[in-house]
């Protein structure tokens, strides 16, 4: 019985830890090839301005693909070759928000996009 209670307590603690950090993406939608979209990621539960942030994506039936990254102060960025020149990552530390401006969209950009701490 003690083991069971310990296990339940551990699960409860881990659940609380997981709930502390929240990253909520928005801005997706349907767009024609060549169109544009801006994704947003609202962050809470941690000091956003202290962390580099990243975008990754997963196309239907495919694995995760790294898309872009930005340093904590926004001064340094990285782009995968597949999106370079078309996507722009940015952040607003005063709003705890990460952005991904996507232009000249292609069929192969179809994916679920995730922001990552």
Swiss-Prot record:
Please give a single GO biological process term from the UniProt record.
immunoglobulin mediated immune response
Gene Ontology molecular functions: antigen binding
The cellular location(s) given in this protein's UniProt record come to: Secreted; Cell membrane
Region annotation Complementarity-determining-2: where it falls in the sequence: 70-77
Annotated Ig-like domain ranges read 20-117
Q: Which pairs are disulfide-linked?
A: 41-115
What are the protein's UniProt keywords? Adaptive immunity, Cell membrane, Disulfide bond, Immunity, Immunoglobulin, Immunoglobulin domain, Membrane, Secreted, Signal
Q: Where is this region: Complementarity-determining-3?
A: 116-117
Q: Signal sequence: where?
A: 1-19
Q: Where is this region: Framework-2?
A: 53-69
Main function: V region of the variable domain of immunoglobulin heavy chains that participates in the antigen recognition. Immunoglobulins, also known as antibodies, are membrane-bound or secreted glycoproteins produced by B lymphocytes. In the recognition phase of humoral immunity, the membrane-bound immunoglobulins serve as receptors which, upon binding of a specific antigen, trigger the clonal expansion and differentiation of B lymphocytes into immunoglobulins-secreting plasma cells.
What is the protein name stated in its UniProt record? Answer: Immunoglobulin heavy variable 3-64D
The gene from which this protein is expressed is: IGHV3-64D
């Amino acid at each position: 019985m003690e083991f069971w209670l310990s296990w339940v307590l551990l699960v409860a603690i881990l659940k609380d830890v997981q709930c502390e950090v929240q990253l909520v993406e928005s801005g997706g939608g349907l767009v024609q090839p060549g169109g544009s979209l801006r994704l947003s990621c609202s962050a809470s539960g941690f000091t956003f301005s202290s962390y580099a942030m990243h975008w990754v994506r997963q196309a239907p039936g495919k694995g995760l693909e790294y898309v872009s990254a930005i340093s904590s102060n926004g001064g340094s960025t990285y782009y995968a070759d597949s999106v370079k020149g078309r996507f722009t990552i940015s952040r607003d530390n005063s709003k705890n928000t990460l952005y991904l401006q996507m232009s000249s969209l292609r069929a192969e950009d179809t994916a679920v996009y995730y922001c990552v701490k």
